[in-house]
Each structure stands twice: as C-alpha cells, then as structure tokens.
Amino acid sequence: MNTMALDQLEPNDIFFQKILHYGMRDKTIQDVLLLEKKPATAKGENYLSYLTRFTLGYTCGVSDRPNEKNQKKVHLIMKEEPETSGETLRYIREGKIFHNERYILEEVVPKIEKLVGKKLGPKVYYFSNNPSVIVMEDLMTLGFQNKNRKVGFNEADVSIVLENMADFHAGSIYLEEQNPGCMSEIENGFIGPNLPEGFFTFIASGVKSIGAGVRDWQNGRFVSISDKLGKKSKEIIQELKVIYECDENELRTLNHGDIWMNNVMFKSDKNGKTQESCFVSNSKLI
C-alpha cells in the first residue's frame, strides 16, 4: 500500500478482512467488502495526516448457531501520512507521530479508560508501521459530532472537556505508577529537538500576524495587545523549547497537546444537551 491507500485497493481486497480480524478478534469474519469511502476532513485541516471515512460490509458467524451467518457493517476512519514531501514528511517519520498515536490509542488509552470508567478515545482496529496507517472506529456512528467552529463551545462543553482532560492526566499518572516505564515509548512530544526549524518559524509568524491583525480593531483599542503579541512572537520559539523539555524530576503526565474543535467530539441527548465527549487524536507527552 502507498499513501492514500484506499484509492489503491479493490473493494474486496484481503486488507479489509485483515482490519476486521485484528480489530474484532473474530476469525469467522469473511466476505469483507468496501462499500463507501470519502474524505473525513476538509482540505487543509490536517497537515500531518490524511483522514478517510469508510464503511465495510461483512459476514460473520453466529455463536450459538454455527450454520448461520450474519451480515453486518462497520464504519471506520483511516489515518495515513499526508501527500507531502521534504521537511514535513521527514519530521512526521523521525518524530514517530504515527507510532506515538497508535501506541497511545491502542496500548494506553484503553487502560486509562478502565481506571476512570469512561470512554476517552476511538478504538484502534488496525495499524501498520510501513506504511504508516492507523484504522480506528468512526465515533460519528456512536452518536458523536464535532461542534460548529463558528459557534464554538458553550460552558457545558468546556466543563466536560476539562473533566476528560483531568481524567486523562490523572489516569496516565496512576497507570505509570502501576506499570513503571509504560510511558517510555512516548516521551518525545510534538514539539521537541527534532521539530524542523521551519515549524517554529511558522508558529512565530502566526503570532506576529495575529498581533498585526488586531492592531486596528475598534479604532486602536487593542494596540497594547498587538504590541504584546509582537513582542511574544520574538520570544515564543525559545519559550516553547523550554516548556516542552522533559524534566525527569517533575510530575509527568500524558498530555493531549492539541485540544481544538476538530479533535474533540460530543454526544448530546435529544434536547441537544451535551452528555459526553471523546478526544479524536492523542499523540503528545510532556
């Protein structure tokens, strides 16, 4: 398989059966067929990966009726390296972005979920290191949705996200206490010594642009804020390097590191009240 794997495969490729055998631990599954596929995000929203939403149909055995078969469907997300090259692709591979996320989602998050008694992220169905591919459950089919980015989060949404973050942090600390060294696989976070200098420059330029953008708001009311952001743009690179440096003597916790609207999904009741949330991506440790 190459990048954009689903575009290279026939609908009945054996790869789809491998996904379900691994993810469902059910060897009676057969006749697996790709029924539908489409991009999971808008162009430009994920620069470190490419996401595809797809549906598989299959048959499987019935436990108490060995001569019968059930026909079922499963809805999944495939995460792959993006169609890019050069510095970005080198960073993705050298920074072990896919390895870290797969390890967290498959090896760490399920254990934390057992400790805290709630779902925190999607189940992993399959992974490959070469090429870098992660297949996980599609949370939308479980009733989870992203919030409207133009509307944002309300107070109840923020409260639930903060509760999940607290459970995630505390659970990771307790898990490390129970199983010393289990976090050693993922000690390198997103921002670290291997991050290309171009990424730091991109961050600094973004802060500077925001400062310039707010300078003329409301007849100069935010000039002081603009000045602060301009100053911060010159300091932020070194500050980030210090903040993300791992300190063996401090209390260490698994940290999501990329909490924004696309990486949090919510489930609501029939009245639209938020009931629970899940993190879509987990890949950072500080």
PLM features: residue spans?
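Conserved NTP-binding catalytic cores of kinases and kinase-like/nucleotidyltransferase enzymes
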Residues: 1-132, 267-279
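A generic signature of intrinsically disordered, low-complexity regions enriched in glycine/proline
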Residues: 16-17, 105, 161, 183, ...
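Helix-boundary capping/turn motifs
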Residues: 25-28, 138-139, 286
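ATP-binding pocket architecture of kinase catalytic cores
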Residues: 75-77, 82-97, 108-189
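ATP-dependent phospho-/nucleotidyl transfer catalytic cores
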Residues: 143-256, 265-275
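Hydrophobic HxD+1 residue recognition
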Residues: 259
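Glycine-centered loop/turn positions within well-structured domains
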Residues: 262
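Activation of the activation-loop gatekeeper triad in protein kinase-fold domains
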Residues: 280-285
